[in-house]
From Swiss-Prot:
It comes from Mycoplasmoides gallisepticum (strain R(low / passage 15 / clone 2)) (Mycoplasma gallisepticum). It is found in: Cell membrane. GO terms for molecular function: ATP binding; ATP hydrolysis activity; ATPase-coupled phosphate ion transmembrane transporter activity. One of its GO terms (biological process) is phosphate ion transmembrane transport. It holds the Pfam family ABC_tran. The gene is pstB. The complex is composed of two ATP-binding proteins (PstB), two transmembrane proteins (PstC and PstA) and a solute-binding protein (PstS). This is Phosphate import ATP-binding protein PstB.
C-alpha cells in the first residue's frame, strides 16, 4: 500500500470494499438459484462478475482502480488524468492526458518533435516499464481494465496491443521464423497451427505473394518496405486488438510508404490502429481521428476532417499551417 493516502481516498476505499462484499454475496446467491436451470450463458456471466468483484475486494492499493465502471465500449482505450515523468521526475513528458481512442478506427497522433507523441503511444502497452527513472500517475484503461492492474497481466496486454516501430525490426532469422518465434514464445507449439498462422499473417500484411517461395531465407534480404510489412505480420500473428505504429513509414521511400498506407486501410477493418506521424498529408490520408499534442498535453482531439479544416485551437491551426513545429 502507498505510504501517503488522503483520508477521503481511504474512506471511499473502505466504503467500496463493503459494497463489493455485498455484491459478491448477492451474485453467489443468484448463482445458486441458476444452478438448477439450464441457463449456462447467464451462469458464465455471473461467474465473470463474481471473479471481477473478488479482484476489486482483494485490492490492497486504494489508489489503483482496476476497472472503470463508466467505460465507453466504443473506445479501445480510455486515458484518465495520465502524467509521465522521465529521469526521476526531472522531465514532465505527459501532462494531464484525458483521451478516448475509438475501436476499429485509425487515430493519428500529430505535433512538434518532443511533444510527447511517442511517449504516449509507448505508454499504451507499458513499454516504459523497461526504462529506469520513469514515474507516472493517472490511469490507462484497455476495454475497461487498468493496464497496470493484475486483472490484465503484462504478457496478455502485449499480445493484445501490438507494436510497429519507426525502423523495420526483423530478427536475424528466416522470414518464417520471424513470425514463428513470436508464436512459440507465447506457447504455441503445434507446427501445423504455426504454419497456418504464418501464412495468414503474411497475407494480412500483404507480403505472402512476395515471400511464399523464400520463406526460409534471411529476413534481412528483404527491402525496407518488405521488412516493415514483415514487422506488421509479426505483430498481427498474435491476433491483437490494437496496432500501435510509431512513424512506421519515416524510413521508407514513397512507393513503400504508399503500400504501408494501403495496408493500414485494410487492417483497420480488423484492428484499432494508433499511428504517430510527422506527415500532415499522411495523417489526412490514413486516419479517421487526429489528436494534436503540444508540450506534453493534448490540445485538441477530433475527426481528422475537423482537425485539418476547422481546428478549434489556434496552436493546432498554426502547426497544421507550418507556423510552429
Amino acid at each position: 500500500m502507498h505510504k501517503k493516502i488522503d483520508p477521503q481516498t481511504k474512506e471511499l476505499y473502505l466504503q467500496k470494499k463493503g459494497e463489493y462484499k455485498e455484491k459478491i454475496k448477492e451474485l453467489v446467491q443468484k448463482k445458486k438459484e441458476l444452478l438448477s436451470t439450464d441457463n449456462k450463458d447467464e451462469l458464465i456471466k455471473i461467474n465473470e462478475k463474481i471473479k471481477r468483484y473478488k479482484i476489486l475486494y482483494k485490492n490492497k492499493d486504494p489508489n489503483l482502480i482496476h476497472f472503470k465502471d463508466d467505460y465507453n465500449f466504443d473506445n479501445i482505450f480510455e486515458i484518465d488524468n495520465y502524467n509521465l515523468w522521465y529521469s526521476n521526475k526531472a522531465k514532465h513528458a505527459l501532462k494531464d492526458i484525458n483521451l478516448g481512442i475509438k475501436k476499429n478506427k485509425v487515430t493519428a497522433l500529430i505535433g512538434p518533435s518532443g511533444c510527447g507523441k511517442s511517449t504516449f503511444i509507448r505508454s499504451l502497452n507499458r513499454m516504459h516499464d523497461l526504462t529506469d527513472g520513469v514515474s507516472k500517475t493517472g490511469s490507462i484503461f484497455f476495454l475497461s481494465k487498468n493496464i497496470y492492474s493484475k486483472t490484465l497481466p503484462e504478457l496478455e496486454l502485449r499480445s493484445k496491443v501490438g507494436m510497429v516501430f519507426q525502423k523495420p525490426t526483423p530478427f536475424s532469422l528466416s522470414i518464417y521464423e520471424n513470425i514463428a518465434y513470436a508464436l512459440k514464445s507465447h506457447g504455441i507449439k503445434d507446427k501445423i497451427k504455426i504454419d497456418q498462422i504464418v501464412k495468414e499473417s503474411l497475407e494480412g500484411a500483404a507480403l505472402w505473394d512476395d515471400v511464399k517461395d523464400i520463406l526460409f531465407q534471411s529476413a534481412h534480404g528483404l527491402s525496407g518496405g518488405q521488412q516493415q510489412r514483415l514487422s506488421i505480420a509479426r505483430a498481427i500473428a498474435l491476433k491483437p486488438e490494437v496496432l500501435l505504429m510509431d512513424e512506421p513509414t519515416s524510413a521508407l521511400d514513397p512507393i513503400a510508404t504508399n503500400k504501408i498506407e494501403q495496408l493500414i486501410h485494410q487492417l483497420k477493418k480488423s484492428y484499432s490502429i494508433v499511428i504517430v506521424t510527422h506527415s500532415m498529408a499522411q495523417a489526412q490520408r490514413v486516419s479517421d481521428e487526429t489528436v494534436f499534442f503540444y508540450e506534453g498535453r493534448v490540445l485538441e482531439h477530433g475527426t481528422t476532417k475537423q482537425i485539418f479544416t476547422q481546428p478549434n485551437n489556434e496552436k493546432t491551426k498554426d502547426y497544421i499551417d507550418g507556423r510552429i513545429g
